[in-house]
Amino acid sequence: MTSSNRYTASEILTVLSARALENGQLVFAGIGIPLLAATLAQRLGRPGLTILFEGGVIGAFVEPGKLPPSTNDQRCTKRANMVLGSADVLLLLQRGYVDIGFMGGAQIDQYGNLNSSFIGDPDAPKVRLPGSGGGNDISSLTNMIVAMKHEKRRFVEQVDFITSPGYLRGQNSRTDAGLPAGGVFRVITELAVFGFDAETRRIKVLSLNPGVTAEEVQDNTGFPLTFDDGVTVTEPPTNEELETLRMLDPERLFTA
Amino acid sequence: MTSSNRYTASEILTVLSARALENGQLVFAGIGIPLLAATLAQRLGRPGLTILFEGGVIGAFVEPGKLPPSTNDQRCTKRANMVLGSADVLLLLQRGYVDIGFMGGAQIDQYGNLNSSFIGDPDAPKVRLPGSGGGNDISSLTNMIVAMKHEKRRFVEQVDFITSPGYLRGQNSRTDAGLPAGGVFRVITELAVFGFDAETRRIKVLSLNPGVTAEEVQDNTGFPLTFDDGVTVTEPPTNEELETLRMLDPERLFTA
Amino acid sequence: MPSSDVQSYATLREDLAKRDRSLREKVVSLEEAAGLVRDGMQVGIGGSTMSRTPMALIWELIRQGRKQLSCSRCIVSTDGDLLFGGGVADEIVTSWFAQGILWGLSKVMRHHVEAGDKRYQEWSHLAMGMRFRAGGMGVPFLPIRSMLGSDLMPLRPEAKEFDCPFTGEKLLLVPALNPDVAIIHVQRCDAYGNAQIDGLQFMDIDLALAANSVILTTERIVSNDQIRRMPDHTKIPFMCVDAVVEVPYGAAPHECYGLYEPMMKHMEAYVAQVNADPVEGMKAYLDRFVYGPKNWTEFLSLIGMEEIVEASRQGRSMYND
Amino acid sequence: MPSSDVQSYATLREDLAKRDRSLREKVVSLEEAAGLVRDGMQVGIGGSTMSRTPMALIWELIRQGRKQLSCSRCIVSTDGDLLFGGGVADEIVTSWFAQGILWGLSKVMRHHVEAGDKRYQEWSHLAMGMRFRAGGMGVPFLPIRSMLGSDLMPLRPEAKEFDCPFTGEKLLLVPALNPDVAIIHVQRCDAYGNAQIDGLQFMDIDLALAANSVILTTERIVSNDQIRRMPDHTKIPFMCVDAVVEVPYGAAPHECYGLYEPMMKHMEAYVAQVNADPVEGMKAYLDRFVYGPKNWTEFLSLIGMEEIVEASRQGRSMYND
């Protein structure tokens, strides 16, 4: 509790994300917060957490202070159990070997669809974003956690372009489209933690981050939010969590 | 010429087969005579002949006196350029990287179709033979040489079962079946060397082995043979060819 | 389920979700490992012909009286004889089944298949590979350009001829094969199942990914630290693996790349005996070499020190310059 | 041919039959190798993001003024900037195109794509992999289970939605990609082109098999004897390869596994300069670092000894225990 004023938005995002991962799980982590959070979880008493990276890595232990600049760099392979082709590591998702896909997001909508391709009309975009990478594959093939900054322009009713499918148009539309497995089940921001309604597949607030009000979350969201019946308040980051995190990312590469 | 009485049927078969291979070619060789003949060709001034084996080998140099008992044994990999998966080496044929497939045969017909699956009715066979192995793939995907013993029961008008396709029912039937590439272009026996008519795709005698008459070849064949207009007589094995061969297979594993 | 049916994606995913894929130690005895293979299962077998055959595990399955297995392997040799003759397999799915070029046809296979009490389901070698690969990729089929036009195609209606929507060409779609269990012998792995395979890998990587459980027998169990020093040498990742058994000479009398070649005197005596009489010869072989020994090491001592040493000398000579 | 058209099998086979695939020495200069890439070709690029990018060859293509290339790569970073900004590529086919997580969007890509003078054709990462793999296998497509339902699917009508004849499930068939030429950087290969790749291999093996010609740049040319001592370490076989160029630090300022990490000061200065002005900043970069140096070694000396040594120290530390 005493540390509540002493962490950045990126830091609480990372800590809460790390908490969502369990020892023994196989987690396919994207670059940035997901990589850092999964590494943090390993260091916080979950050494049996296996991290997979898109570059073609199974079971890496990233070294403190040596965060890789992408998931395709050699630093991702340090003390890994296996290095393999990048299509082959994605096929592990398709086959079903991976428990959790864990990605950042640029823009998300009420059904958990992610856009990382276009702002505006795809034929004449206002902004051409980087694109899918493995994002489409991960979200199509695996149960997924998204960690992202909470801003009104990022939390929209409907994304301009579905790069990575959440529940598409809700209900059974994801399964009907040919995606019977996986789906986003958690969205973690610096304000709150979200889940999805089992039937409508619409996003809902599960818990508020320490010191954050429901109103504040709604104000930063571009559509009317649903709050779970039993909305809780998340425990603030502990000193151990923050210290370990700062040891891992001393230059604040991902937690600026 | 002086050596004409001093070689076995297997030996002339191997020597003539080796002669059919050129330096620089990529040859996918089956076990037995093909492996031995390709190795002989390497030793007779064609060191740039690359031998591929079904076990997953590119560019092996089999050692004298250490002939492998199959193309899936470690002896096949000695001083190879590459070892890879056995499906992957077959995919090289499908992609088109290999010049020549080179196999033995149990039974062949007038269109070069090979049977290594069943004698008699496949539903209640008189003899269940070993089956295709890579034979079907090699003959479907590559220009092929077949080396085999010449017996009436092995050279038949129509095989009981097409395990490995030659020209199927002749003319364009092979291409029409979905096999536009490759096809058997030489059959080598201890009696003669055969090619195929460019149009009918029926087998024909190109040359007679030394001391063999046309009648003798016909007598040992289960259907009426066509003889090429310019049928020649093959040069007998030289002392160098025979000596090198016997150095490679001192125990007469494949040349008994 | 018939061995040629393609599993639905929902079934595949559910079965895999149930497995404990976490990083955990999995070392068990040969007897316990064989217990994971149950009557009637589809069993994928690693290695090829006489190479890296998981012989110790097959030997133990016969000893435990396993029944009605459907076994698949890229190429089958005397292991197939034992699976049929030892009573454990009713069906073998493969591309080639004989004792080897040195000995010709398998009289044991002929005896059982021609009499109709056992089945040999034949595919081309590439088709076997693409069936395992499809299974490992989590797709129901892969396209190939062989088997077309031959009599193998009508023999295998489980594969489907198909007009390519891109090029109009004819292709054959071969169905995924996802065995219930795969048994694979490797040179070394760690206690979690991270396996290194030296030399010929055959179809073992695809098979390990395709199967719904995997048993590794290994010449040697090494530390996880050793694996992590060369992660690009790992060929099978731990999360595919359900059990690890250390069995030195676990492929005997077949070979294990870089360690030992086949034990040819034992093989020759075996072939002479079963080809002379595929029923009584096999029974005598099983009595003496499978049911007789107390354990695998005693089986090795029946092969004899001279053969083991000679096979090892030959095997290690692969690395002579 | 449009970059998304699938080549017929007849064309693929004819093109491959014309190549000299024999075991022969293929060592050429960087200048000669770049000459094998002709205007308008489809060029597949090895490595990924900032790893094992064949930077020296890309640098030489810009110097030689190559034009209208369609370049494909699994993931594109500053190499894509240079291909667009240097005027050599009109189209980039990939799954992700940015400067890297540290710097965010590529202003150079945005400038050209949003203005419409260059095209970024987007696929999912797995789709890129399966496109190269289909190309390498000699089949016109492979089935995948992603891209379905998303807006990427209608964006890419080159892929075909498909009802599986085995299971009735929806699948996406992605078309084979067989580039005219692949450019791949490796740690070592022999004069024939037998290549060893350490660590991350990305999609390079599939790409090498798929392409209709392959240029390898390599940190080091080793003897064929050395290759033949460990044939299971060869990742790309010689018959795929048409030219071999020895270029130490040939991926600079990107990384090469086990040898050097990215040269971050150079990268940061580059990014700051081109993001401030994607046209003039790029022009200034090209003038100084691409057109300016006499040769690749002079480019390295512009990066500076301190950066090269530090990147090498970091790169080699991968093998520290």
Please place each PLM-identified region on the residue numbering.
Chain C
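Conserved alpha/beta enzyme-core scaffold
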Residues: 1-321
